[in-house]
Each structure stands twice: as C-alpha cells, then as structure tokens.
C-alpha cells in the first residue's frame, strides 16, 4: 500500500511539474512573440559588406523593442529588382516598411503601393529629405549626401586642393553623384568631368583609377564613395607609389580604410554612422506601432527617452542629429585622432 501511495503521489507531482513546465514554456513563447513585423529593403548588392553594420543594428533594435525585421535586397544591386521587392512587401502587409531611395523615379511607383495601404514608411540612406516627404514617409534617417560631400570638399580646399577624381562605384544610384557634386562645388570645379564610373569589381576599379591618374597627372586628390571603391583605390595608389602623396578621402569605413588612415594614405573617412540607419528606423516603427502616432516630435521624445537606445549610443560612440522632421546620421569624420575608437567596432557596429 505504501508503495502504491508513493507511486500515486509521484504521478501527481510529475503531472504538476509537467503543467508548470508547460505554463512556463507558454509564458516564454508569449513573451518572445514579436509585437510587430517590419521589413527593410535596401539597394545594396550582396557583395557590399558595408551593410553588415546595418544588419547588426537591425538585430539589436529588434531585441530592444521586441519586434521582427526582415532584411531584403537585390543580390546584384539591380534597382528594378528592388522595386519588385517593395511591391512584394506591400502585398505582404507588413506593420512597417523601411526603404532606401536609390532611384526616386524608378521606385516611387512601387513605394506608392506601400503608402496606399497606409503601411508606415521610413526612408533611409539614399535619397533626399524632400524626396522622402514626397513619398509619404514619416521621416528620413540618413546623411544629406550633398552636404557631406561639400563638407569634405571644404577640408580639401583648405589643404590647397584644386582638382580631384571622384571614384563612383555605384553610378546607377543617382544619389551617389550628390557626394561628388558637393565636393566639386566646394572646390569650384565641375563634378561631371571629375567623376569616374568605376563599377564594383575590385580589379576593374583599381585598373580604372590607375589609368585615370596616369592620363591626368595633374590630379591633386581622390574622393572614393565607399569601401567598394576606396579599397581598390588604396591598392592603386600604393602600386603607383603615390600613397600618402596624393590627397585622398573616402566616404564610409572598413578595416582597410582604417589602416590607410593610420598610415597616412587616407586623410579621413566621412562617417555616416550606418548603425543609426539600421537601428533608428526599426525603433521609430516600433514606437509608431506601440504609441499609435506618426508625429515626428512625439516619436523623437519617445526615442530619446528610451534607455536601451541611449545605452547603444554610449557603447558605440554614436551621435545622431535631430531635425524638425528627420534624423541625421552624419556626416562625421574619422581621422588619425579617433580612428582607434571607431576601429574597435568596425564592420560590426561602426
């Protein structure tokens, strides 16, 4: 009898434990369920590792705000493919959509299918604040490209530079030319005659830069528009024996650029703080969903008051700039003086 009672008691305890375990798992599953489902669609090809920082930022924003964000991009960087991805996003009825304005004219029709369904829209990275407003976005998060180019050009002008080569690895993106134009107008020269459509193959970029500099020996400076053009240009300058002699600046950042800043090949990198372009739009859409508001002022207040967001900024040494409607992620400048701090998180969060 005692054995039977013990067995019965054990069965009861086992059943109770199973129920408690099931309840705990159910509670965890409920807690883990995301509050919203967003998508970020970029123009970047798979080969562009610069976007890894943005992908990492998306993951951290998802964690901090308990949401899920898909990342989509055209594998080869084809804008027509990007347009189709946007149309697919509209059809899937996401809780929010984030897009780059790689080509306003090509993408506006696809983006209109998102806003026609009253799906909250944020634009990032490429494009202008004016284009963002025309598309019906809540806000734009990015770096004003012309302003950034001009700021870099003013530094070049102060160094006595009067001529330059703009190495454009993404000429299919109209916004990319704003960087060249801003730099050129700071110097007082024509950007069209100074811009090289270099393509994205590293060997081709290196070859084209070398050929241009041989054919234009009076060129005093080089401006690269990102790692895909900067890294091969570094090799070209070193191979030609002019590294450190030719004034050289670039947009964006990676470990090769960091080394070139440290050894004097590159004067500075124009930092658009890409982490902010991944984190902030996800955070904004989460606030829109939770607080039922599209008011930029209220969204900014909620964002700035969020301790998890502030902790991320402090850890990675980031500083957004806030406008009346939009949030700026740059430009900042990475030089010999601050490159070591940035390098600590390069390729991951900087």
Q: Which residues are covered by each model-predicted region?
A:
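Short, solvent-exposed amphipathic alpha-helices that sit
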Residues: 49-64, 148-152, 174-191, 208, ...
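Flexible loop/hinge segments that line or gate small-molecule binding clefts
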Residues: 68, 105-147, 161, 254-262, ...
């Amino acid at each position: 009898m005692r054995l039977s009672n013990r067995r019965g008691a054990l069965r009861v305890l086992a059943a109770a434990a199973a129920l408690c375990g099931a309840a705990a798992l159910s509670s965890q599953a409920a807690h883990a369920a995301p509050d919203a489902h967003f998508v970020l669609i970029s123009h970047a090809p798979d080969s562009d590792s610069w976007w890894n920082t943005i992908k990492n930022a998306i993951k951290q924003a998802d964690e901090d705000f308990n949401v899920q964000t898909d990342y989509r991009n055209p594998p080869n960087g084809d804008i027509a493919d990007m347009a189709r991805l946007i149309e697919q996003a509209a059809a899937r009825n996401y809780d929010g959509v984030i897009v780059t304005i790689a080509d306003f004219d090509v993408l506006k029709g696809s983006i209109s299918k998102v806003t026609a369904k009253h799906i909250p829209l944020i634009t990032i990275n490429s494009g202008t604040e004016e284009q963002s407003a025309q598309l019906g976005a809540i806000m734009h998060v990015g770096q004003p490209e012309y302003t950034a180019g001009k700021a870099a050009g003013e530094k070049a002008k102060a160094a006595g530079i009067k001529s330059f080569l703009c190495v454009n690895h993404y000429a299919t993106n109209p916004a990319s030319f704003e960087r060249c134009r801003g730099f050129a107008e700071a110097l007082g020269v024509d950007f069209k005659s100074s811009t090289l459509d270099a393509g994205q193959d590293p060997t081709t970029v290196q070859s084209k830069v070398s050929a241009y500099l041989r054919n234009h020996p009076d060129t005093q400076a080089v401006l690269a528009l990102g790692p895909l053009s900067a890294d091969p240009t570094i090799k070209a300058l070193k191979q030609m024996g002019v590294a450190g002699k030719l004034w050289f600046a670039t947009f964006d950042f990676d470990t090769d650029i960091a080394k070139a800043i440290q050894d004097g090949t590159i004067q500075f990198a124009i930092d658009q703080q890409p982490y902010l372009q991944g984190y902030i739009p996800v955070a904004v859409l989460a606030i829109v969903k939770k607080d039922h508001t599209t008011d930029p002022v209220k969204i900014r207040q909620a964002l700035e008051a969020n301790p998890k967001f502030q902790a991320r900024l402090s850890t990675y040494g980031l500083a957004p700039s806030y406008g009346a409607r939009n949030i700026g992620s740059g430009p900042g400048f990475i030089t010999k003086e601050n490159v070591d701090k940035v390098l600590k998180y390069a390729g991951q969060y900087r």
